[in-house]
């Protein structure tokens, strides 16, 4: 017994002694990606010899620091005639930390450049000097209520808010979610969400997984010339490469799915790696345990992602990457014996809905020399939406004290399939003329192949008599060349200018020259001021161009032009010690050329893009206008000393004018939004870490109008009075979230258990009005009868997960 206890104690003590990890990476010039040989990398932790853990980069800019105790530290990188960079790193025993460190060359000729108060979370694209935020996977993973979803994480930033708790559409400065572009490796990708409605940018569950992402950029306005076809914002996402020296694995099980990730070297030379992951939904399992998901129907979905990375001779890099997802849901109202309204469905029909998206690309990058860098991507993508509805004719059956619903008949109501394929090409070349001047130029080109079919009943009460709403097979191209110039006037002053051009063949629309300007100046005392302005254009959702409801071949909106925008902003920020910063920004955006109906009405494309409905517009013309202006404040302490907090607040106004000439609130004008997040980690012993975080969000209520009851009853759909559109507002939105996690570092592995309690107070926030007819004749015939109900957003939602990171073999070279 004594020997047994001794062995157990020995094994236990070894697990404590083994809590170390390696830090590896590459140091490069931030503008040309050229490797910096001889750069010094140092961690603020002393080893057994009394000196800090440190390394010097080799001829390829690579470094390795071995056997660093797990924990959080500051890592500083220095190189002659470059500005030093300090960042916080966190090591756990299950995954090696691999960094890509970008240093900016100094304009001065001093060997040692001193820069105080370097900001953690600096934007990766240095051409973006205003309204840009680094999307840090490490930082945003701590945000409660974000469900590990990039879009929901971004909704915590100033100027950004979610449109609906059940979806991740984001509203940027009062703009429609239609204006958001998702970009990966230079390519604009299809909507990366499950259950995505055609033309939208959001959905209930993201296909993207933060475990495959590196730090990325989120840009909200006056973005550099390389970005186009957007009047709102851009997610410029970076896919990380797999570990090229040893195999590592991640498994996770929870409410949102069961997933597995594997990464590692493809050969013993360490010049090729892979990263692969897959996820499948587990909602049905949790529904069985009585956890309410906001709908009686059980959605199913699965997704995968991969990246194969190959280091080529003479500094080139080739990567093959891809991601995709498939989802489906069946809302069977006919199976219910008691009438209920459903968040995702309508009470008078069975609905079957499925979507899929996939994108795969081949990217080549090479630092040609110390001054020139080229990146080129060729990609194929596809997205499909399929749906069919069966109409239910029902009646009430009363038997004694029991009332049940009787299905009298079921017949097809509508069906559609929208399929869009895209072949994309992107090339950009960065050339550093000298220390002060950088030029970047290139193009994006997309070839769209569309196959869109839709038919519906002419009349609800006449089965099998259909009319065609969409019947189109064809193609079009979108071409976007650009050129951008950056002038580093001094080490403290940057000026950028660029021109973006855009041509869309479907409507023969051309925006020949969109000017983009940016300016940033660093003041004394770790302060800076910045300003920017830009012209932007955006095409409409593809299917809206080929609406066929007015007869075969009569695509009455095929000539729609771009929506256009002039966006400007100014700002100020101050950096303090220990990762604390304050930032404020004021902006004004004027939108014009917005599609509105030819006949006078309140309709405007500016209000479209969120929710689960497509756009059914009449004949449109580009005469609508709108504006957004606001003031944003961000007070932030980045995660340091085991604590973080973030306050973001926005006061704004968002208005538009339709073809009737009336100035109205847009559907996204909540007037204000504020977020307060805070989190603290507690170290329990040598291996365990307890994390607690909370988030409080409040915002102006959603806009709505008076219902036209006559038209609503006739159309069997919710119809508002046109003259009163968006004149009313629901009560203010309020939600509180709480996140609790426990992490344990064991030998060669890390365990984590988390509970994200979304809307912990179960606040009943109003989402919208809905068409909800009664089946009771006594109710229908009453004088005050209205077939309208209020829909609330998601209530309390506990999201549980268990995650394990572990490694197998391999030693750093």
Name what the model sees in each region.
Residues 193, 199, 334-335, 339, ...:
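Surface-exposed extracellular loop regions of Gram-negative outer-membrane beta-barrel proteins
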Residues 645, 696-716, 733-735, 742-813:
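C-terminal beta-signal and adjacent terminal beta-strands/loops
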Residues 254-280, 293-332, 352-380, 433-441:
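Transmembrane beta-barrel wall of Gram-negative outer-membrane proteins
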Residues 490, 588-590, 612-700, 803:
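Gram-negative outer-membrane beta-barrel transporters
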Residues 18-112, 118:
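Periplasm-facing N-terminal accessory domains of Gram-negative outer-membrane beta-barrel systems
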Residues 83, 90-98, 114-223, 234, ...:
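Periplasmic N-terminal accessory/gating domains of Gram-negative outer-membrane beta-barrel systems
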Residues 317-367, 382-406, 410-419:
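Flexible loop and strand-edge segments within Gram-negative outer membrane beta-barrel domains
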Residues 414, 422-424, 469-475, 480, ...:
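Outer membrane beta-barrel strand-and-loop segments of large Gram-negative receptors
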């Amino acid at each position: 017994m004594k020997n047994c206890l001794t062995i157990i104690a020995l094994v236990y003590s070894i697990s404590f002694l083994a809590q170390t990890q390696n830090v590896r990476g590459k140091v490069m010039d931030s503008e040309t990606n050229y490797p910096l040989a001889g750069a010094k990398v140092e961690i603020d932790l002393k080893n057994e010899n009394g000196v800090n853990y440190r390394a010097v980069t080799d001829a390829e800019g690579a470094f390795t620091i071995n056997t660093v105790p797990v924990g959080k530290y500051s890592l500083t990188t220095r190189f002659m005639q470059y500005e030093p960079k300090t960042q916080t790193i966190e090591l756990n025993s299950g995954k090696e930390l691999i960094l890509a460190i970008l240093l900016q060359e100094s304009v001065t000729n001093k060997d040692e450049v001193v820069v105080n108060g370097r900001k953690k979370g600096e934007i990766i694209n240095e051409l973006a000097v205003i309204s840009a935020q680094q999307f840090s996977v490490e930082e945003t993973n701590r945000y409660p209520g974000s469900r590990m979803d990039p879009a929901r994480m971004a909704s915590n930033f100033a100027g950004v808010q979610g449109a609906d708790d059940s979806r991740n559409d984001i509203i940027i400065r009062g703009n429609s979610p239609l204006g958001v572009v998702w970009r990966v490796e230079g390519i604009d990708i299809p909507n990366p969400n499950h259950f995505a409605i055609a033309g939208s940018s959001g959905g209930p569950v993201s296909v993207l997984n933060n475990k495959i992402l590196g730090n990325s950029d989120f840009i909200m306005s006056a973005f550099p010339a390389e970005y186009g076809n957007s009047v709102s914002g851009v997610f410029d996402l970076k896919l990380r490469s797999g570990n090229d020296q040893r195999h590592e694995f991640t498994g996770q099980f929870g409410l949102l799915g069961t997933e597995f990730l594997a990464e590692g070297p493809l050969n013993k030379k360490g010049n090729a790696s892979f990263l692969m992951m897959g996820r499948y939904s587990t909602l049905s399992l949790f529904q069985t345990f009585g956890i309410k998901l906001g709908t009686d129907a059980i959605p199913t979905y699965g997704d995968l992602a991969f990246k194969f990375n190959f280091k080529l001779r003479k500094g080139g890099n080739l990567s093959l990457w891809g991601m995709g997802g498939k989802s489906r849901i069946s809302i069977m109202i006919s199976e219910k014996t008691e009438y209920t309204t459903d968040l995702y469905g309508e009470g008078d029909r069975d609905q079957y809905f499925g979507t899929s998206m996939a994108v795969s690309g081949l990217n080549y990058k090479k630092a040609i020399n110390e001054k020139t860098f080229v990146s080129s991507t060729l990609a194929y993508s596809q997205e499909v939406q399929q749906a069919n509805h069966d109409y239910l004719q029902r009646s009430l059956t009363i038997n004694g004290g029991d009332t049940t619903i009787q299905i009298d008949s079921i017949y097809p109501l509508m069906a559609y399939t929208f399929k869009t394929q895209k072949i994309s090409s992107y090339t950009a070349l960065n050339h550093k003329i000298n220390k002060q001047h950088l030029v970047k130029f290139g193009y994006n080109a997309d070839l769209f192949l569309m196959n869109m079919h839709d038919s519906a009943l002419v009349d609800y009460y006449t089965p099998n008599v259909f009319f065609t709403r969409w019947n189109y097979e064809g193609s079009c191209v979108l071409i976007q060349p650009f050129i951008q110039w950056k002038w580093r006037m001094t080490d403290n002053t940057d000026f950028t200018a660029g021109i973006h051009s855009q041509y869309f063949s479907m409507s023969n629309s051309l925006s020949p020259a969109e000017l983009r300007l940016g300016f940033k100046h660093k003041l004394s005392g770790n302060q800076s001021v910045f300003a920017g302005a830009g012209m932007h254009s955006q095409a409409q959702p593809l299917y809206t161009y080929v609406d066929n409801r007015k007869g075969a071949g009569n695509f009455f909106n095929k000539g729609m032009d771009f929506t256009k925008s002039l966006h400007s902003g100014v700002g100020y920020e101050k950096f303090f010690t220990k990762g604390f910063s304050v930032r404020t920004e004021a902006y004004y955006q004027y939108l014009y050329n917005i599609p509105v109906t030819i006949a006078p009405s309140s309709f405007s494309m500016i209000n479209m893009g969120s929710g689960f409905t497509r756009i059914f517009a009449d004949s449109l013309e580009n005469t609508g206008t709108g504006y957004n202006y606001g003031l944003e404040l961000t007070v932030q302490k980045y995660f340091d000393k085991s604590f973080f907090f973030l306050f973001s607040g926005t006061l704004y106004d968002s208005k538009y004018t339709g073809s009737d000439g009336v100035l109205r609130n847009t559907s996204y004008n909540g007037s204000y939004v504020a977020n307060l997040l805070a989190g603290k980690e507690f170290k329990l012993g040598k291996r365990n870490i307890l994390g607690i975080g909370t988030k409080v969000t409040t915002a102006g209520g959603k806009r709505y109008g008076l219902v036209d009851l006559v038209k609503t009853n006739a159309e069997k759909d919710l119809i508002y009075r046109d003259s009163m559109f968006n004149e009313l507002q629901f009560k203010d939105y309020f939600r509180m979230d709480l996140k609790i996690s426990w992490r344990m570092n064991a030998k060669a592995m890390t365990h984590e258990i988390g509970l994200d309690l979304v809307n912990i107070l179960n606040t009943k926030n109003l989402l919208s009005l809905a068409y909800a007819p009664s089946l009771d004749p006594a109710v229908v015939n009453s004088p005050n009868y209205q077939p309208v109900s209020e829909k609330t957003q998601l209530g309390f939602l506990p999201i549980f997960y268990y995650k394990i990171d572990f490694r197998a073999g391999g030693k750093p070279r």
